[in-house]
Regions:
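N-terminal beta1-alpha1-beta2 module of alpha/beta enzyme domains
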Residues: 1-71, 76
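Flexible, glycine-rich active-site loops centered on histidine and acidic residues
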Residues: 7-26, 86-121
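Structural motif
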Residues: 49, 80, 110-112
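Catalytic metal-binding/acid-base residues of hydrolase active sites
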Residues: 52, 82, 114-116
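Structural motif corresponding to the early beta-alpha repeats
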Residues: 76-88
Length: 121
């Protein structure tokens, strides 16, 4: 059984949202249960990542966070990290501004250059 742990202001714990489902269809009920339970247990944040070139298909991170924003009310929502060279800066800014509005200011944006250099030539 999982129990909530209070660590005060010393440590803030976050967890990853399920984004990949090996050899099975995407199960949004799993995403729902994990997200809501993490909030109930007092986790500070939920995280997605962008794995555009991964072997397994995964859910688009900002769209997934918008879904989770509608299921939760206090937990922060972040991407660790978006592969910046693959995005239009204006569209990315708008997507995150929309997520931040939809979540009442809970969005956390992480950007980086990406995973490995091979996909970029």
């Amino acid at each position: 059984m999982v129990r909530a742990v209070s660590l005060g202001d010393r440590i803030k714990l976050g967890m990853a949202i399920p984004q990949t489902f090996a050899d099975t269809p995407v199960d949004m009920m799993v995403v729902r249960r994990v997200s809501q339970r993490a909030e109930e247990l007092g986790f500070e944040s939920l995280w997605t990542s962008e794995g555009t070139f991964s072997i397994r298909p995964n859910l688009e991170p900002v769209g997934l966070l918008n879904y989770v924003a509608g299921l939760t009310s206090t937990i922060r929502l972040g991407v660790s990290v978006l592969i910046f060279p693959l995005h239009s800066p204006v569209r990315l800014a708008k997507a995150f501004a929309s997520l931040d509005q939809a979540s009442n200011g809970r969005a956390i944006m992480g950007i980086g250059l990406g995973e490995k250099s091979a996909p970029y030539g």
